[in-house]
């Protein structure tokens, strides 16, 4: 049985209409950005390389697919 990937929230911030979170999986080292749109309740989740995680957290739409 494979283990589930569990992300830990490292940081979160509010921007106009959005909540942006940076998450990390301690077992795999994967990082991801979560962008929640507070107006329409949509959620955008995408992986980012660890080396770019800080910049992606500050500028998520540069890195969004």
Residue ranges and their predicted role:
Residues 1-65:
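Polybasic/polar functional segments that serve as interface/processing modules
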């Amino acid at each position: 049985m494979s283990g589930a990937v569990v992300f830990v929230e490292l940081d979160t911030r509010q921007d106009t209409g959005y909540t942006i979170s940076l998450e990390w999986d301690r077992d795999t080292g994967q990082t991801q950005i979560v962008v929640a749109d507070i107006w329409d309740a949509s959620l955008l989740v995408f992986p980012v390389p660890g080396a770019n995680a800080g910049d992606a957290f500050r500028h998520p739409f540069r890195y969004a697919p």
